[in-house]
Amino acid sequence: MALPAPLHGVIPPVCTPLGPQGEVDTESLTRLVGHLLDGGVHGLFALGSTSEVAYLTDDQRATALETVVKAAGGRVPVLAGAIDTTTPRVLDHARTAAGLGADALVATAPFYTRTHPREIADHFRRLRSTVDLPLFAYDIPMAVHTKLPPSLVAELAADGTLAGLKDSSGDEGALRRLLVRLGGRTGRRTGRAPGFAVLTGSELTVDAALLAGADGVVPGLGNVDPAGYVRLYDAALAGDWERAAAEQERLVALFAITDAGPESEMGRSSSALGSFKTALHLLGVLARGTTAFPQRPLSEQSVQEVGRRLTAAGLPPVR
């Protein structure tokens, strides 16, 4: 389906449910897409960090994306991560995603290798010119060790290379500078790239990003509570910033589930992704909360903590 320009609203990065042998659990994934659509989301982002894309084989990636596209059924656009180290490998993923029916692509800067901003620009231009789908840049320096400069993003937005940005840098100052470059809170639609989408990946500061002029959010926690993020977005759209802030504060408290796994026992990604999947299992959406190896599973004590946080947020577990 055609993307709105700019893409806006709540676009969760879809978790990839796994079976007991690590296979993609397509039945759970189909239920998850239904859960997200029932929550009112405006799009779906498959094969991102929250999808555990770095752990998935090419076959698993294809199965997950195919399942999301089929379950979405054209009701909302599906963005597909084409995440890999260098341009030729990203192009392979991009071609596969296009063949499976994705509506847009999401790619990071090259990583493992060290690249100059001009090389990063060439990377995105090659992707856009080779695969005819809208392209979103994914700014996640903690994973790729390169921060996309606001000047570079604005350049690629203005020349039509990029349809949007998913900003997971955590650098709120850089995000604000980019928004100002693009016309500021009230001048975006008449600025240098009126159809360019700026999406924050910082689920704890969505109200602030929307107030600054961002178009939407890509929240990992949105897997668990999509309706909450939609309420936040709708309140901001209506200019009801008090209601938006109240919803944001409830979601901040719920986000504490990501620390359910002790730091002495597992990585922070293992804890966060495990908590999202555990929450979805407790809510009856996923058959299990399995994460990809070698991430460690949450202990029973941690699972109980996730359940307590869900109840406190008004999302009582059914398991």
Give the role of each language-model region.
Residues M1, R189-T190, R319:
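Actinobacteria-biased recognition of intrinsically disordered, low-complexity terminal regions
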Residues P12, D25, A46, S51-A54, ...:
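Short, flexible micro-motifs
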Residues A2-K147, Q295-R296, P316:
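Active-site beta->alpha loop and helix N-cap motifs at the rims of alpha/beta catalytic domains
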Residues P6, I11-P17, G39, D225-R319:
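C-terminal alpha-helical cap/extension of soluble enzyme domains
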Residues S129, P141-A260:
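Catalytic alpha/beta core domains of metabolic enzymes, predominantly
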